[in-house]
Each structure stands twice: as C-alpha cells, then as structure tokens.
C-alpha cells in the first residue's frame, strides 16, 4: 500500500460538479493499493498516519499528530500511484490492484483510520475527481507498507 500524504489547511473533492468530501484542515491522502496488499497493510498504514507527528507545536517543531491537533482526513483512491514509468512513454499499471479488490481494501483502510479516532471524508472510488487543497508547509510524505 502506498499513500501520498499532504498536510492541508483545507481540502475538498468534487465529482460531476458536486463536492462529495471536504475537510477544514488535516491530512489529504492519495491512496494506492497493489494486488499484494492485505488488511494488515491497511491497518499498519492507518495507525502510522494517525500517529505521525507532522504538525508543529508551539516552538515550530513537528511534534503533533493529526489526532493531537484534532484534524480530519480526506482520503482519495488513486490507482495511478502504482504506475510504472520506467519503460516507454505510457505508464504501466499492472502493479495496481484490480478494482473490486482495491475498493474493498480501500474501504477497510478508511474504517481503520476511523478506528484511530479520526473523521474521514472520501472521494468516490473509481470516479474522475477534482481534488482541491491548500498544502500546508508544504508537507508532503510518501508512506508505504512494504
């Protein structure tokens, strides 16, 4: 499992002109799932993200988690995170999980994030989405389970 995490001042996701998910501040997650991922990977990433200290304390050090600052999570599925661009001019997406498996694991992942005590908004799995955010910092990290 691969997640691109962005600390966000605000974020929203729109499908067909309608906002389907939005947060006032917290983390925006782009979530990629490969065919080898399991529920164990999803749980590991959910716990890691909830407790990752990437929000600043009073002295400006990254010392607080999204839980500590009472932020929220906007989670967006993104199979293109497993695009292999090493050969040719078109990405190869063979490492991305098949949609039915990926959707089940993506839903499980979001529930695991919720179990950590976070409010989670989502996009629409498999849809073309417009994602808007103000990246705070900018702070952008890649979190992987393997």
Swiss-Prot record:
GO CC list: cytoplasm
Keyword tRNA-binding set for record: yes
UniProt-recorded Gene Ontology molecular function terms: D-tyrosyl-tRNA(Tyr) deacylase activity; Gly-tRNA(Ala) deacylase activity; Ser(Gly)-tRNA(Ala) hydrolase activity; tRNA binding
Enzyme Commission identifier(s): 3.1.1.96
Described function: An aminoacyl-tRNA editing enzyme that deacylates mischarged D-aminoacyl-tRNAs. Also deacylates mischarged glycyl-tRNA(Ala), protecting cells against glycine mischarging by AlaRS. Acts via tRNA-based rather than protein-based catalysis; rejects L-amino acids rather than detecting D-amino acids in the active site. By recycling D-aminoacyl-tRNA to D-amino acids and free tRNA molecules, this enzyme counteracts the toxicity associated with the formation of D-aminoacyl-tRNA entities in vivo and helps enforce protein L-homochirality.
Oligomeric and partner information: Homodimer.
Protein name: D-aminoacyl-tRNA deacylase
Compartments, record wording: Cytoplasm
Gene name per UniProt: dtd
Sequence motif Gly-cisPro motif, important for rejection of L-amino acids, residues: 137-138
Comment on protein domains: A Gly-cisPro motif from one monomer fits into the active site of the other monomer to allow specific chiral rejection of L-amino acids.
Coiled-coil regions, chain positions: none
A GO biological-process term: tRNA metabolic process
Protein species of origin: Bacillus cereus (strain ATCC 14579 / DSM 31 / CCUG 7414 / JCM 2152 / NBRC 15305 / NCIMB 9373 / NCTC 2599 / NRRL B-3711)
Main location per the UniProt record: cytoplasm
Catalyzed chemical reaction(s): glycyl-tRNA(Ala) + H2O = tRNA(Ala) + glycine + H(+); a D-aminoacyl-tRNA + H2O = a tRNA + a D-alpha-amino acid + H(+)
Keywords linked to the UniProt accession: Cytoplasm, Hydrolase, RNA-binding, tRNA-binding
Record-linked Gene3D superfamilies: D-tyrosyl-tRNA(Tyr) deacylase
